[in-house]
C-alpha cells in the first residue's frame, strides 16, 4: 500500500544520478530515497535501444521491490528511450525523467527562444532534448553541443582546475556565439561543474540543472497527490549498486558534499 511514508526510487546507469539525490535531499529532506546505480553495466549511451530498454525494465524491477510511491529516471538515455518501459513496469507508480523536467523548465525560462543543450555524445546524437523542447514549443531554436570530457573531469574532482576551464571555454564558445539565453545541463554529472560553467557563460544566461528541475517536479506531484512526507527528520538514502567501484566513496562525498557515506548494498540485476 503506497502512502506518504513510502520511499522515492531513483535509478541511473552509474553514479551521475547522485546529483538528483542531492537535489531531492535539499528540497525534500524527509523523503526516504532508494538509489540504484547500475555501475556494472555503465555506460548505457553506447548500447542499442533494445538493450537500453531491457536495462530500464530490470532497473525498475529492482526499485519496485521497495514499493516506491514514485520513480525518478536520473539517466538521460533511459529518459529518452525507455520512459514507457519504466511506466509499464512500474504498474501505476508515478514516473519522472530528468530529460522532460529539464526541457520543460528551459522552455519556461527562455526569453529569446534560443536554448543551448550540453550533454554526452550519446545524448546529443539522440537529439532527445531538441525533440522534447520543440515538441513543447516549436518556435524555439535549440543548439546542442557534446561535451564528452565533462564526465571524467567531474569524476576526477577537477571542478575548478585551470585545465577544466580551458576545456569548458572551448566547448561553450560555439553555443555562446549562437546568442542563447538558456543552457540545459543535459547530463547528471554536469551540475558538479555548474559554478564553473556559469562563470564562463556569465550571469545573463540561465543554467538549467535537470537534477533540480526533476526534484522540483517531484515535490509538486507528491504534494498534489497527498504523498509528501511531512516528517521533520532528515533521512539517509539507501544506496544500491550492481558493482562497487573503487572510487564510489570519494565520488559520493564529492557529489553530495557529504562527510559520511552510508552503507552501500550490492545487488544483482
Swiss-Prot record:
One of its GO terms (biological process) is regulation of cell shape. This is Glutamate racemase. InterPro entries: Asp/Glu/hydantoin_racemase, Asp/Glu_race, Asp/Glu_racemase_AS_2, Glu_race. It comes from the Bacteria. It catalyses: L-glutamate = D-glutamate. Signal peptide: none annotated. It is an enzyme of class 5 (isomerase). The active site is at residues 75, 187. The lineage of its organism: Bacteria, Pseudomonadati, Chlorobiota, Chlorobiia, Chlorobiales. Belongs to the aspartate/glutamate racemases family. PROSITE patterns: ASP_GLU_RACEMASE_2. Its EC number is 5.1.1.3. The gene is murI. One of its GO terms (molecular function) is glutamate racemase activity. It comes from Prosthecochloris aestuarii (strain DSM 271 / SK 413). Substrate binds at residues 12-13, 44-45, 76-77, 188-189. Keywords: Cell shape, Cell wall biogenesis/degradation, Isomerase, Peptidoglycan synthesis. Provides the (R)-glutamate required for cell wall biosynthesis. Pathway: Cell wall biogenesis; peptidoglycan biosynthesis.
Amino acid at each position: 500500500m503506497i502512502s506518504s511514508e513510502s520511499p522515492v526510487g531513483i535509478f541511473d546507469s552509474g553514479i551521475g544520478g547522485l546529483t538528483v539525490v542531492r537535489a531531492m535531499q535539499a528540497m525534500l529532506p524527509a523523503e526516504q530515497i532508494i538509489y540504484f546505480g547500475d555501475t556494472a553495466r555503465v555506460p548505457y549511451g553506447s548500447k542499442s535501444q533494445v538493450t537500453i530498454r531491457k536495462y530500464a525494465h530490470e532497473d525498475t524491477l529492482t526499485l519496485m521491490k521497495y514499493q516506491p510511491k514514485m520513480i525518478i529516471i536520473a539517466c538521460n538515455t533511459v529518459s529518452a528511450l525507455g520512459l514507457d518501459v519504466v511506466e509499464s513496469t512500474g504498474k501505476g507508480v508515478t514516473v519522472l525523467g530528468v530529460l522532460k523536467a529539464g526541457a520543460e523548465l528551459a522552455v519556461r525560462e527562455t526569453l529569446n527562444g534560443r536554448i543551448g543543450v550540453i550533454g554526452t555524445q550519446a545524448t546529443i546524437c539522440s537529439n532527445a532534448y531538441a525533440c522534447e523542447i520543440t515538441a513543447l514549443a516549436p518556435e524555439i531554436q535549440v543548439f546542442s553541443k557534446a561535451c564528452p570530457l565533462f564526465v571524467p573531469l567531474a569524476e576526477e574532482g577537477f571542478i575548478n582546475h585551470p585545465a577544466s576551464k580551458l576545456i569548458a571555454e572551448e566547448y561553450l564558445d560555439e553555443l555562446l556565439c549562437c546568442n542563447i539565453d538558456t543552457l540545459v545541463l543535459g547530463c547528471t554529472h554536469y551540475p558538479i561543474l555548474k559554478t564553473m560553467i556559469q562563470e564562463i557563460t556569465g550571469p545573463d544566461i540561465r543554467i538549467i540543472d535537470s537534477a533540480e528541475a526533476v526534484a522540483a517536479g517531484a515535490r509538486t506531484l507528491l504534494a498534489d497527490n497527498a504523498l509528501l512526507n511531512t516528517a521533520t527528520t532528515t533521512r539517509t538514502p539507501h544506496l544500491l549498486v550492481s558493482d562497487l567501484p573503487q572510487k564510489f566513496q570519494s565520488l559520493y562525498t564529492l557529489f553530495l558534499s557529504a562527510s559520511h557515506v552510508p552503507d552501500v548494498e550490492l545487488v544483482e540485476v
